[in-house]
Amino acid sequence: MAERANLVFHNKVIDGTAIKRLISRLIDHFGMAYTSHILDQVKTLGFQQATATSISLGIDDLLTIPSKGWLVQDAEQQSLILEKHHHYGNVHAVEKLRQSIEIWYATSEYLRQEMNPNFRMTDPFNPVHMMSFSGARGNASQVHQLVGMRGLMSDPQGQMIDLPIQSNLREGLSLTEYIISCYGARKGVVDTAVRTSDAGYLTRRLVEVVQHIVVRRTDCGTIRGISVSPRNKNRMMSERIFIQTLIGRVLADDIYIGSRCVAFRNQDLGIGLVNRLITFGTQSISIRTPFTCRSTSWICRLCYGRSPTHGDLVELGEAVGIIAGQSIGEPGTQLTLRTFHTGGVFTGGTAEHVRAPYNGKIKFNEDLVHPTRTRHGHPAFLCYMDLSVIIESEDIIHSVTIPPKSFLLVQNDQYVESEQVIAEIREGTYTFHFKERVRKYIYSDSEGEMHWSTDVSHAPEFTYSNVHLLPKTSHLWVLSGNSCGSSLILFSIHKDQDQMNIPFLSVERKSISSLSVNNDQVSQKFLSSDFADKKKSGTPYYSELNGILGTSHYNFIYSAIFHENSDLLAKRRRNRFLIPFQPIQEQEKEFIPHSGISIEIPINGIFRRNSIFAFFDDPRYRRKSSGILKYGTLKADSIIQKEDMIEYRGVQKFKTKYEMKVDRFFFIPEEVHILPESSAIMVQNYSIIGVDTRITLNIRSQVGGLIRVERKKKRIELKIFSGDIHFPDKTDKISRHSGILIPPGRGKTNAKESKKLKNWIYVQRITPTKKKFFVLVRPVATYEIADSINLATLFPQDLFREKDNIQLRVFNYILYGNGKPTRGISDTSIQLVRTCLVLNWDQDNKNSSLEEVRAFFVEVSTKGLIRDFIRIGLVKSHISYIRKRNNPPDSGWISADHMNPFYSISPKADILQQSLRQNHGTIRMFLNRNKESQSLLILSSSNCFRIGPFNHVKYHNVINQSIKKKPLITIKNSPGPLGTSIPISNFYSFLPLLTYNQISVIKYLQLDNLKYIFQVINSYLIDEKGRILNLDPYSNVVLNPIKLNWYFLHQNYYHNYCAETSTIISLGQFFCENVCIAKKEPHLKSGQVLIVQRDSVVIRSAKPYLATPGAKVHGHYREILYEGDTLVTFIYEKSRSGDITQGLPKVEQVLEVRSIDSISLNLEKRIKGWNKCITRILGIPWGFLIGAELTIVQSRISLVNKIQKVYRSQGVQIHNRHIEIIVRQITSKVLVSEEGMSNVFLPGELIGLLRAERTGRALEEAICYRAVLLGITRASLNTQSFISEASFQETARVLAKAALRGRIDWLKGLKENVVLGGVIPAGTGFNKGLVHCSRQHTNILLEKKTKNLSLFEGDMRDILFYHREFCDSSISK
């Protein structure tokens, strides 16, 4: 030992890492005994000092970091700006989430780093600081939560909650923070429990694989080795990892520097020798590893290397397998939840920032950079090579070099302030992360209409889908609006000055009830929650469902259409709409009760000739029970074609209705129950039951009679026939017929009885199997069809007073074919006969071309009285948006007085004098000159849509006066556009009509002598609530009033505005929020320009959503979206978290050889290397064997690197040799692939690699096999010991197979002996007879083999070394 005088005194704080290093050096120099003596002294000293100090912990010792205030404030400011950018549509949700998390993570980390220097400066003997810093109790991250900030938390799914906990535990948490903290804490507790069990099971499987590996020999005589080089072709291996890899190994080859041998084969590498080799700059060092050991079920001392416990070569008999398994499994149980701040959103992928040292101007070469977008959505420049950035201030010029693939966040010649971030250096570009693809769905915040910019690829990704891909960064817009039930009914035709209710059929999307009707099942089932509340059963009776066309005075309000339920009875065929009405007042008594009349209007509002206009269900022809309809061979005329007729009942097969020429039909009742296949039926087929007999567990019969059970596909049909059972004798005539109706008066001719029948009966012959047949006589209900129903009965006389050329005829239809069964659902009744009103019109010359007419509802208000009418218009009515070619250019409006009216409207004066109700507009209708097309305009009467006008705008009285000249409608002072109309050419001639309606079809403004240039776009209707109706026939959108923004541009500065900004506001243009339109104020909301006028612009509010390339857009252009619909799916890659909670599954994934989605970054280089190498392999005998060998070597190295990387990311040091022993076991089997060795092995059999080689050499015959990677579980079940396999998993299967095959267990492993209670064949004092230490013999054998196989062995070693250089992704990882 050195003299005390020569010792150096280190006055330093020693932490845990330094202690570890010190102890390993002491063991190296002085051995175990001396080191333990020194450590005892250190322990005693520690206890003495701790007793003397007697540290206690109080709440005052938790000192908050002073810089926390401004750090948190700064982060909040950044988050606020980020939120704004997201709102403006500059960044999308994924970028926002990413950046938000990075901002708070960086803040939290900075605080954590500040903590120790702060303690050191202010209070170095602070108990909290001493405890955490020494590692005695707690660690930095726990103390950081006490005195710094608690930071980001994960939710139970492992996703980040992007709201951080800004408080620390010393300050206390707010309510929100407390709840989020509970999330994180709960996840922590659950993760700890799960991790402990996972790690325990992983350890068990690892030990299972390698329990039999014991050091049995000193040298196996291998000449193979693996070369390790500090300077790999791809990147530098860090020196620390290089030293860790080499220390404790044994050299496989001599190392020469020049001609001098500095280290020889089989020499173990200590720290001194390794340092010397590094100093000499040795290129590659070949070392022995467990991979190169030639043994199958054991390992030799030299291939294993030094024992980790005492620093000498491992001793014979040591169970190194179990040590390896424990070493890999143990960190999983011991590690605390490290860095679980990120919950896997990103890991250590935070970039280094380059900050400006002082204020100044930035200069760089713009040719070397290229504009891009960072992953946070910021504009930046990407530099491809080293870029020199100069910062010039008044007196200093500072130059910074930025490495390639970094982002430059400032522009050339930009002024920067001190400490401003100017560049972002990404972390080492070669580090290979496990990436996972994550989908993030963006949902619509509001209802509206979808618009794309032109950048979306309009062809969907798949033929039948509505998913479109985005080729470049662009915006998607959701234009505000609410869907309206059907704009086609509303706006088919309106008469001039009709007042109309705009939200007439508006329906909530979710309340259109679905019809659950099977074929031939008559009644409809309305699944509506509103109905369910009002009635016990969810299926209301028929009479309540059918609305009414009320009669007396025809006073209706639109809300009578089941408005509280909002149920429109949408039919199976989508082209029809059924609108039931309810009357307000009582009906006059002479009319039929209002239980049934319903108007049926097609959903597009178009009637064809002979189509049904209304129908009436007479309650006399209504049955509650199921049954069969019969009308024998009576004549029936089919009067309506299938395509024009809709089956009201929802039957899938659209049968034509039959008009009855005869006035009688019959109904044979029966009780029918349709039961699921699995029902337990409590009655037998052909048995007779009484009333209220239990049929199944919860169904009782309503009538008594004969049971018939029919089993059909997936259901059971159970019928109960009521009636008499008649056992006939041979002479009975009735018994010969089956299924016939017998009228009254005919008797049963029978020897015993002769009886006249009072009613019709139905005779049915029934033959139960193997029994005598009998006849069932069933009662029949007879119905007469009355001809007395006509128009006068159904409707009052004055209803159709202007029906000049409209014809309405009344028909009775039987709704079921002859012999067809009718089925009722639950409580609903069945209508057998329907009275229908068929619509037709005159065939005069003028309208002979009209094959179809339009119908719609009109609500007219007169003197406070509100009336609803149905109007059928016999004019061709295409709302024209675009002028037809044959129109003369000066075509204008013609009054529509000569139109053929269906009904008269109350005097116009009444309409004008009354004050219009809030939800009404007035329709102006124009007929174009050629009388072929119509257009309409809804004018409004109030100014409630003038949202926040500018105060300085004055309205001119001229407008109002010009309107009064021709008093069309009462208009209050309303500056805004009231509607839009078709092409206008001769503008000034129609000034009185159109002044107030500065037509909204202006495409752009040109202020040249106030001549306007008009161009046509889509028309919109605006009502007085400010609701705009889109007249597109394919979309039903109502825009909401509150979401329209009006901007008034004062006429005085309008010229200046155009001149200065030289912007042209064009219709349809989109604006993001905060963009300046007018000179004085920025535009506050985002939207689309809808109307441009001389003094105002109307903007339809819209919300932009940014989407980046590769995003998937759902839905089609102009599709109506509802709140919560998916708009976009972002697919982005995120690094899988290096968190141990996620890290353990990753280790397990590698060891179980499950697929990983990611592909290695240097795959291309590997393939090139293979191509070079393959030519050498092909020329060698046993080339396939070398191929398999190379594959196995490569996979082994790759697996070791992957596992090491996970542990190193956690700061856990595990020696490579432990992992190598495990990996060797899972890669040591090959699969026999062909019949080449059928005399020895079977194809598909798993055999050891070394065994395959030896067998091949012995038989001098090629074995075809391929390398397989077994997971640790499969490897445990493919060992030489069936006792070991059986004690692991699948005990019965393993033992049964072993018995059938007659397997022998030689009890070589540890586990088998433990199971059978024998002595464990391991340990340094174990019987030496088992340990083969004949080193001399091995060497002699080796020499012989080398002579015989020198060609093969030498070449192979070269290939292995060569391959090691190009495929080694470096053990460092």
Swiss-Prot record:
SUPFAM superfamilies with a match to the protein in the record: beta and beta-prime subunits of DNA dependent RNA-polymerase
Q: What catalytic reaction does the record list? A: RNA(n) + a ribonucleoside 5'-triphosphate = RNA(n+1) + diphosphate
Matches recorded under Gene3D superfamilies: 1.10.132.30, 1.10.150.390, 1.10.1790.20, RNA polymerase Rpb1, domain 3
Q: Which GO terms describe its cellular component?
A: chloroplast; DNA-directed RNA polymerase complex; mitochondrion
- What broad taxonomic lineage does this protein's source fall under? Eukaryota, Viridiplantae, Streptophyta, Embryophyta, Tracheophyta
Main location, first listed in the record: plastid
| Needed co-factor(s) | Zn(2+)
Q: What EC number is given for this enzyme? A: 2.7.7.6
Name of the protein in its database record: DNA-directed RNA polymerase subunit beta''
Question: Entry cofactor note text?
Answer: Binds 1 Zn(2+) ion per subunit.
Report the subcellular localization.
Answer: Plastid, Chloroplast
What is a biological process (GO) this protein takes part in? Answer: DNA-templated transcription
Its assembly, as annotated, is: In plastids the minimal PEP RNA polymerase catalytic core is composed of four subunits: alpha, beta, beta', and beta''. When a (nuclear-encoded) sigma factor is associated with the core the holoenzyme is formed, which can initiate transcription.
| Role summary | DNA-dependent RNA polymerase catalyzes the transcription of DNA into RNA using the four ribonucleoside triphosphates as substrates.
Q: Which keywords, in A-to-Z order, does the entry hold?
A: Chloroplast, DNA-directed RNA polymerase, Metal-binding, Nucleotidyltransferase, Plastid, Transcription, Transferase, Zinc
Enzyme's top EC category = transferase
Question: Does the keyword Zinc feature in the UniProt annotation?
Answer: yes
GO molecular function term, any single one = zinc ion binding
Which superkingdom, per the lineage? Eukaryota
Q: Which InterPro entries match?
A: DNA-dir_RpoC2_beta_pp (IPR012756), RNA_pol_beta''_euk (IPR050254), RNA_pol_Rpb1_3_sf (IPR042102), RNA_pol_Rpb1_4 (IPR007083), RNA_pol_Rpb1_5 (IPR007081), Rpb1_funnel_sf (IPR038120)
Q: Which Pfam families match?
A: RNA_pol_Rpb1_4, RNA_pol_Rpb1_5
| Record family assignment | Belongs to the RNA polymerase beta' chain family. RpoC2 subfamily.
HAMAP family (UniProt xref): RNApol_bact_RpoC2
